[in-house]
Regions:
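Acidic/aromatic-lined carbohydrate-recognition and catalytic surfaces
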Residues: 81, 85-100, 111
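C-terminal active-site subregion of NodB/CE4 polysaccharide deacetylases
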Residues: 1-80, 85-88, 154-254
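A short, conserved beta-to-alpha structural element at the edge of catalytic cores
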Residues: 100-122
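Histidine/lysine/aspartate-rich catalytic loop segments that bind and position anionic ligands
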Residues: 110, 127-162
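Acidic (Asp/Glu)-rich catalytic clusters
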Residues: 16, 55-56, 93-100, 125-144, ...
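Short loop/turn segments at strand-loop or loop-helix junctions that form parts
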Residues: 25-29, 107-109, 145-147
Length: 254
């Protein structure tokens, strides 16, 4: 759907009425790349502006695990990052300045430096195991984003267990940090994938479907609002308000 049409609809859409946790989804926080047709690289300047807006507008940035608790404040926001890009380390420094927390979903294949890039976004530098440990020591949460970043809905039973349960065991052993959250690669999941995440011991599993979340304990269908390089500050504000949540229906149709 054309960006101009999305913005026009969002400008007229009502704000979300229900209280809950809005989970933001970021990827790389870095300069533009001509190959980045999906807008995965949000600039450092834009990211800082967005964090400043959260601060001045009175949003409360909470850990993703806040969703496991009782019903929340209506302006709760959780911040998440997928793929474990090295540029996310700079984002962590900005978050510290504002006193914000976040969850970083990492992939051991990338942490090991064995990328064998198959997509343009895999060519970007990724953080190391030492970087992941530094995030844990800095008070951030590390979550799992699978072992190698496949489409889990296409994995056979044995590989699915390794990608979902095996990565949890590996991260916990290497980082000495309990892993309770999972992010589905590409946002793709089905009943079998969700059940595997539950049996592996995760309490939360994140999608890339727009929407707001009402805390009610363990959840394997966490909605997230993606922030992209194409978002202006007014777009970011509208996403916080839920004015883009109608896109979830469009995602379902696709």
């Amino acid at each position: 759907m054309k960006r101009a049409l999305r913005r026009a609809i969002a400008s007229l859409a009502p704000a979300a009425a229900e209280a809950g946790v809005r989970v933001l989804l970021y990827h790389a926080i870095d300069g533009p790349d001509a190959a980045d047709r999906m807008g995965l690289r949000v600039s450092r300047e834009a990211f800082r502006e967005q964090m400043q807006l959260l601060h001045t507008a009175g949003y409360r940035v909470v850990p993703l695990t806040r969703m496991l608790e009782a019903p929340s404040f209506s302006r709760d926001v959780a911040i998440t990052f997928d793929d474990g890009y090295r540029s996310e380390m700079r984002a962590a420094e900005t978050l510290k300045e504002f006193g914000f927390t976040a969850t970083f979903f990492v992939v051991p294949r990338f942490l090991d430096g064995m990328q064998q890039p198959a997509h343009y976004w895999e060519h970007w530098p990724h953080m190391s195991w030492d970087d992941a440990r530094a995030l844990v020591e800095g008070g951030f949460e590390i979550g799992a984003h699978s072992m190698t970043h496949p489409d889990l809905t296409r994995c056979d039973a044995g590989r699915l267990i390794e990608e979902v349960a095996g990565v949890k065991a590996l991260l916990e052993r290497r980082l000495e940090h309990e892993i309770v959250s999972f992010s589905y690669p590409y946002g793709r999941h089905n009943r079998h994938v969700r059940e595997t995440a539950g049996r592996a011991g995760y309490r939360l599993a994140c999608t890339s479907r727009y929407g707001i979340n009402r805390p009610a304990g363990a959840c394997y269908n966490v909605a997230r609002t993606e922030v992209t390089a194409m978002d202006r500050l007014v777009d970011f504000r509208r996403k916080l308000q839920g004015k883009y949540d109608w896109l979830a229906r469009w995602q379902d149709l696709r």
